[in-house]
Regions:
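Structural preference for solvent-exposed beta-strand-turn elements
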Residues: 1-421
Length: 421
């Protein structure tokens, strides 16, 4: 699908931002593993969360709609299970150690770039602790055996999803475990979200310098009812659009004290020069003259595409550091961002771990490729609002991975978008 967007700044109110995909994955898994039923409120079914739900259903859990909420009824399937992870890295990296901790033979598959996304050293650590895995890098990926408690070692600068996956799996193992983190932990807020969700289901992990201590054989306990918080990652696109609009944008349904690392979007927009206001669960952003800044993206990799758009709409040079891991996302996001900016008349360059953007105060029109990457497609849509001519986004359906209603909300805010097959 192509999306053709004509220039026009957005304005108005996002009455309810989509639920946090990161929190949703964790809530679904903890609820499915818990003793007792859980009523989950505030869920929105994007492709990635649907993949996790269907995987847990294959493993024996039942998900029943109740009005706008979902009741999760834990259960176990005997015998081998087949799990389709779609294009969701979280689904793959969370369910893989989970099946092994349960001693459940499984065959995992997926599509797109998922097979080529890294599993090392998670796979190595699992095999050193009782699990057997088939050849990595190709689907189907088969796992059998049972994950043992013990000492695990993971690098902090590869993927926080490896850490989160083991954290959620190891309470189900017999015996206590330790996860030692070597080097600096990047994307630490995602690990904090995991620990926070586990605590709400009665599993407390002790954190010491450079390691996590997990009590085994205790399991999860349902809190009865839980609301999944709003998504700062998804809201970031509307906040960025507000920073381009003199009328501004209002976004509701955000937790200002959230553990989500992408909550930094608000502070970064202030640093660029935009006007921001926040109270309760409501945030307002308006355009003001913006200038280049320096950004450390180590903990906020998902914000880089939309921050690059804001940087291009500002005046002057912006440097975004610690971006190397972006090459291993749904697309090579370093190359994808550079291609997006270039197609819209913006000069930018990147080294191994840094991107430099020469802000020109706006964009030309043009045709851009989403590279089937949801965050590239949504960033391009924000850029189109401040472009000099129409912007065509190829494979714009990629937004469904995390935000199926993105273009519908875009129209409600005054955006002029036409979707073409």
């Amino acid at each position: 699908m192509k999306a053709v967007i004509h220039p026009g700044l957005l304005h108005g109110t996002v009455e309810r931002v989509i639920c946090s995909k990161s929190a949703g994955h964790r809530a679904l898994i903890c609820a499915a593993m818990a003793e007792g039923e859980t009523l989950l409120e505030g869920l929105d079914w994007c492709e990635d969360l649907t993949a996790t739900r269907k995987g847990l259903e294959a493993m024996g859990a039942c998900f029943r709609p109740e009005g706008e909420a979902w009741r999760v009824i834990p259960g176990r399937t005997a015998g081998k299970v087949f799990l389709d992870c779609g294009e969701s890295g979280s689904t793959l990296r969370f369910l893989l150690p989970l099946t092994a901790a349960l001693g459940q033979e499984a065959e995992l598959t997926g599509r797109g770039k998922l097979a080529s996304r890294p599993l090392f050293p998670l796979d190595e650590q699992m095999m050193e602790h009782g699990a057997w895995l088939s050849e990595r890098g190709v689907f189907p990926l088969r796992v059998s055996g049972r994950l043992r408690a013990g000492k695990y070692t993971l690098a902090g600068n590869v993927s926080s999803q490896f850490i989160s996956g083991l954290l959620m799996a190891l309470p189900l193992a017999e015996g206590d475990s330790r996860i030692a983190i070597t080097g600096e932990l990047q994307s630490g807020p995602y690990v904090d979200m995991t620990l926070g969700m586990m605590a709400r289901f009665g599993v407390d992990v002790r954190r010491e310098e450079g390691c996590f201590l997990i009590r085994g054989g205790r399991g999860y306990a349902s809190p009865g009812q839980l609301r999944v918080e709003g998504d700062w990652s998804g809201a970031a696109f509307w906040l960025a659009a507000g920073a381009l609009s003199p009328e501004g944008l209002r976004v509701r349904g955000l937790d200002l004290s959230s553990a989500q690392g992408d909550r930094r979007m608000l502070a970064l927009l202030r640093a660029f020069g935009a006007e921001t206001m926040a109270a309760g669960e409501e945030v307002v952003v308006r355009a003001r003259p913006m200038h280049g800044v320096e950004i450390d993206a180590g903990d906020i990799p998902d914000l880089v595409p939309v921050l690059a758009v804001v940087a291009a709409a500002a005046r002057g040079e912006t440097r975004i550091r610690r971006i190397a891991r972006l090459r291993l996302k749904e697309s090579d996001r370093v190359a994808s961002v550079l291609a997006l900016l270039s197609a819209l008349g913006v000069s930018a360059r990147a080294g191994e771990d840094e991107m430099v953007i020469e802000g020109r105060g706006g964009f030309t029109g043009g045709e851009v490729d989403s590279f089937r990457d949801h965050r590239i497609a949504m960033a391009a849509a924000v850029a189109a609002c401040a472009a000099e001519g129409p912007v065509v986004i190829r494979e714009a359906q990629a937004v469904s991975k995390s935000y199926p209603g993105f273009f519908e909300q875009f129209r409600l805010l005054g955006g002029r978008v036409k979707e073409e097959d």
